Structure formats: C-alpha cells, structure tokens
Design a protein with these regions (language model features):
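NUDIX/MutT-family hydrolases
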Residues: 132-138, 144-180
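Short histidine-centered catalytic/ligand-binding loop motif
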Residues: 64-73
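Acidic, metal-coordinating catalytic segment for phosphate/diphosphate chemistry
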Residues: 2-30, 110-122
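Flexible, glycine-rich phosphate/dinucleotide-binding loops
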Residues: 40, 58, 104, 144, ...
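N-terminal strand-loop-strand
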Residues: 12-64, 92
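Short active-site-proximal "capping" loops at secondary-structure junctions
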Residues: 55-58, 70, 100-103
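Active-site segment of metal-dependent pyrophosphate-handling enzymes
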Residues: 25, 48, 78-81, 85-143, ...
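Active-site donor-binding loop signature of nucleotide-sugar glycosyltransferases
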Residues: 54, 67, 158
C-alpha cells in the first residue's frame, strides 16, 4: 500500500505554538510495595501492601500509595527506593519500573468532573498536571515482621483495600494484573 501526499492528513505547523501554550507538568514517583503475609487467623500467606495516610489536601485523611514529587537530585529508581525505605524501613528485595501514569485528567479537580463515569475536562479549571512513574517492589516474606510501624502507615490485604486517593486504586489494579500475567 502506498500513501500519496494528497492522502496524508494535514499537520498544523509548529510555528502556531507559543511557550504560553504549555502548562506545567510535575513528575512524581510512587511505589506499589508487595509482600506475602498471612491474614490474622490464617496460615496461608496472601498479598499485602502498605499505604500512607495523606496528611494534607487533596484527599487529606485518605490512604494512598507511598510516593511523592521527584526531587531534582534523585533518579527515578532512587526516589522509588527511598519511598519504600521511608514507608517500611526496609530495602527492596525487588524493584522495577511498572508504568508511567500520565492521563491528562489525573488531577483531583479534573477527576471530580465525570459524565457516565468517564472524566471530562473542566473548562477553565486550574489544576496541575502530574505524571507518576510507578515502581513495584517486593519485600521478602522473612522481613515483613521487621517493617516500620507508624500511625500513618498501615498494611492492607490487596483484596480489602479502601478507596484510595488520586487514581491509586487503578494503579494497584494494574500492578496486580501485571503480576498475574
């Protein structure tokens, strides 16, 4: 099959864009930390992950994946490892980049506006766009009992997660899908 110049879609020239057309995009790193541990009263281990209670808006008081803005002096992997250590007090047994989540409508203000469950842009909404590079990590079962204890960090079985801040439920679902496949 050949494509003639007449059948090629028109592309707007780059000259039409100005610096003002580009909004700010922030980069964050989050980590889905998985560990096998038994539920209370059971012998067989199941998958658990630690969540962090948000101490500020947006989503103050809700649980979220450990993470935050990428610091200028950190690599992505360093930020993911730091997040894991801060949440659990442990070094990862395994750490790998899972996916980059960059939906334009990830911001809380944008996620609030939905039609039939699908997010829609909010005209004039002033929200910062955040792209999250998500890592997944595992902690050896032998070290789970040594994890850090803190009132704003709690381990949850993956089949009993609360409603998480931001799009973190979707991120966990994707991590579990990848783990199974």
């Amino acid at each position: 099959m050949s494509i003639s110049p007449d059948s090629t879609p028109a592309v707007e020239p780059y000259d039409d864009h100005t610096e003002g057309d580009h909004s700010s995009v922030s980069l964050a790193v989050s980590t889905v930390i998985l560990a096998l541990r038994p539920k209370e009263g059971q012998q067989h281990p199941s998958l658990w992950l630690p969540l962090v209670r948000r101490l500020r808006e947006p989503y103050k008081g809700q649980w979220a994946l450990p993470g935050g803005p990428l610091q200028s002096q950190q690599s992505l992997e360093q930020a993911a490892g730091y997040t894991l250590k801060r949440a659990t007090g442990l070094e990862p047994g395994y750490l790998e980049q899972l996916y980059a989540f960059g939906d334009v409508l990830r911001a809380p203000e944008a996620r609030a506006a939905r039609i039939n469950g699908a997010p829609v842009p909010v005209p004039g909404a002033d929200h910062e766009r955040v792209v999250s590079v998500v890592y997944w990590a595992s902690i050896p079962a032998t070290e789970v009992s040594q994890t850090r204890v803190h009132e704003n960090i709690r381990w949850f079985p993956v089949d009993e997660l609360p409603e998480l801040a931001f799009d973190h439920n979707e991120i966990v679902e994707y991590a579990l899908y990848r783990l199974q496949n």
